[in-house]
């Protein structure tokens, strides 16, 4: 998780906007559509640059238009910032298809099945998402009384609460029993 505050560059953006007459863009942990909309409505910036958010969910614009849930960036920096710094292939822990969109397609199945997923961690729910998108009926089994697996531990520090918020978005994104 990043230790830099959300929307951290807005102060500088406001200063630039006050002295120029051209459109001004902002970046810097603007990780949700709601945060971006507020910045635009307040007039702080004219354009929002979603970087890592688009690695997590490249279909944000269509999902906003259709009222669908969006996978939000955790700001964990694994696969994106870490990869850039070590000159590796870009990826995202929440988007297995990232970087392979033109070669990996979630195809509808020819025969629907009842699919059982054991464990409701991020990985389990990710598998459930793919099975559901293929057309299967999905049931997730979890032995504890809380869904999320290790995300429950990860989200304890205050700056990591985003993990739990994201997990709740994921578990409510698809009709999974």
PLM feature spans:
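Flavin-dependent oxidoreductase catalytic cores
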Residues: 1-118, 122-138, 146
């Amino acid at each position: 998780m990043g230790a830099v505050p959300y929307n951290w560059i807005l102060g500088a953006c406001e200063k630039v906007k006050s002295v120029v007459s051209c459109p001004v863009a902002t970046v810097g942990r603007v990780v949700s559509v709601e945060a971006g909309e507020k910045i635009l409505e307040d007039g702080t910036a004219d354009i929002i640059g979603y970087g890592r958010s688009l690695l997590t969910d490249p279909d944000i614009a269509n999902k906003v238009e259709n009222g669908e849930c969006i996978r939000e960036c955790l700001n964990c920096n694994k696969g994106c910032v870490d990869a850039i710094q070590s000159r590796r292939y870009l990826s995202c822990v929440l988007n297995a298809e990232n970087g392979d969109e033109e070669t990996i397609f979630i195809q509808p199945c020819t025969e629907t099945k009842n699919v059982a997923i054991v464990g409701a961690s991020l990985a389990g729910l990710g598998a459930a998402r793919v099975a559901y998108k293929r057309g299967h009926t999905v049931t997730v089994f979890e032995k504890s009384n809380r869904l999320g697996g290790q995300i429950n531990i990860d989200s304890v520090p205050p700056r990591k609460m985003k993990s739990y918020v994201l997990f709740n978005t994921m578990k409510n994104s698809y009709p999974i029993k």
